[in-house]
């Protein structure tokens, strides 16, 4: 495979993702010249998020269920967000852990491409540090790829979570980024975050 940015070859690094319930022989493909992430190889198939998955996904939020979707979430959460849209501490943005086993993960699809995700800690899930249980669904993480920001997808997260948990209070994990605080404040005031 060739890097689309600089037309150089890629090198493969094997990843052990079994702890995330991701099956298969997984290799991360990085350009040998520009050292940037290119794609993931799953067994003999290449998974490139810049290619379209038009045959499978509508323009909407979809709950993660399949092995391929777990890999897509891994790429968004552990590679794209961290390496291409580097979290900015001054905006209270932080790197994310991969979602816990009982978390609900939703991926946003637009024109057949995964453009972001959000995760929810379900009501009753144990808080590891205190052994208490969440008393309401909690929005834990949220991310939209930089190329798709300022197009209403952040506000959509709040609308989607409210739709999925009607008649329930919804919490937010902390720290909460400045951007999500803006969306949350706009949603509760009725003005929207955009």
Predicted regions and their residues:
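Short beta-alpha junction loops
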Residues: 175-178
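Conserved acetyl-CoA-binding loop-helix of GNAT-fold acetyltransferases
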Residues: 141-163
